[in-house]
């Protein structure tokens, strides 16, 4: 957005102050420059704000960049750094030095001893940047680390919690977004303080490629799974049935809405196939659910577009950049249905023990900022969802790249043939070409076509991502041709030689219609730092992006043109403002739909985020207490009350059943005076104390008893939380039907989620009694406590 006059004035004012300090910094000795860190920390300790010390801090690290790296940040980079400290997003074009710019806000926020995190998409970039910039921070007396073992670390042992605490305890930490998400989850599942990773609250995060993290990945939760459920045999039955269906007769597919359903004929066919009377009878709902999963897998999960099969496993692809999403699965059974479709081993469907999305994770920081080359396109969503303004930073040199109008074709074959003609021409001129395919499958097809034409080339897709940096580095060589999926849109810069500059620079050729932000990312690979270059996209009405969002009118137009072509009319390229406007409208409609989906998901995630924060606070209180006796007494009293609430009248049979299910498996003789609820409560409390006292005789120290208490309470909490997360995930799947029924889905969801959380607290207390009473405890040879929960 356009900053108001005051904000623009603030940025210019701070830049002038930084520049005025430059001569003073240049005259300092190394020792004097290094002493600035202690001086700045004293000023912060005395009460100065970060903005007040920013000019001196930025001038200090700017000079340190020059002395250590030989690189002196430009004024535009200082402007970007000022924006990043304000908690905004700095849009800086490819090649404008975001890596160097980040040294300034990271140094400034690292002065507080509270941690400054630089979050990148992958370990290669995090390690590269930390290795390059660590000497600057260390020169100035700050500690720096990566939140993972570097590639140079050859140790085979697993990472310990102590190592992770040391990593996250540094002043400045370079990390990956996914690694950080999983560390957060595992840290909050730890059984004691020693198992937790984060020594201090989250303070400042600077997110590289912020649009990819906070938008593209916003709806994909990171999940730690619990024990698997029993594997259903219905996946194979449903898959075999779906394969037998006849299009249009048995099912209808609406790709625009990502909807597929059985027709009346299809329902009757299912009832005949499975020999049942009514497919919609409640007793067959699991069968119907598996049929729906198989339908969705067959028609909306496309191999080498949405996923790949490698080493007998289905691995998802990130549709925005074509990278493998290892460790992430599609939820609600789609993963298992797809595995069945591909004939690989079906993984067990697991309950979710813990989950978090990026919006929830980064919402925990005191301040979050971002940088990207293409955030401006989605600035309204950043403002509405994250309250983060997007500020476009001027380039150091004017951008002279030519972005040529897209060429529009009727069919995919016509499009590819023309695109390849252009590649051959550019290759013969000696210009390097980055040829972008929309999927892994298409990149392999294009590679075959290039081989048939005798054009040597590299292929960069999910199958060889390990060579990404080397391939991208060579992509600017004279005459080089690189076929790549969207993953080539971010990361390592493509540098060109003087000879290539004279020939026109790098040419980016896209072979599919893409979302506007992805298109800008790919086009931005050419023309860095004032270099010449061109970009042009070849699109057809058969591109996935187009077919999934076509209106009925657009489909009629397409079919009409195809009929004419088959009748002999020479229709190859489509011209005119009308078709361009239609495609522009289609692209906007898709973008609006995706934004709406993210907004809706974030609305439900907000409820989970609040419950997660409350739950982890309760859990950490249990971990942090050195003496849990009072807490255990309180939980036992509450748990007994919740058990007694289940019945209004308690006779001896019901009491014995309660005791044998939750207190002891041994036979008990009940007192004769258990005539009312109060007497039953007193009896159960006394029984609990007797059992705990008996267990305590096995132990040697009070610390062991406290450890036993902690294990019992945490296990009760974690089991209850797993059920809660699983319930909320299921609850989301019902939202659509509530909306169709005219109910406020958000209100109903929040109401049911709240009620479920209250039940969680009750269940945790009752499960704690089960754990305390029915567990078996012993000491091993090292006198360490061993607890077996029955």
What does each of the following model-derived ranges do?
Residues 315, 324-327, 545, 549-790:
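Extended, charged helical/alpha-beta scaffold domains that provide interaction surfaces
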Residues 1-566, 587, 593, 598, ...:
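Conserved P-loop NTPase motor core
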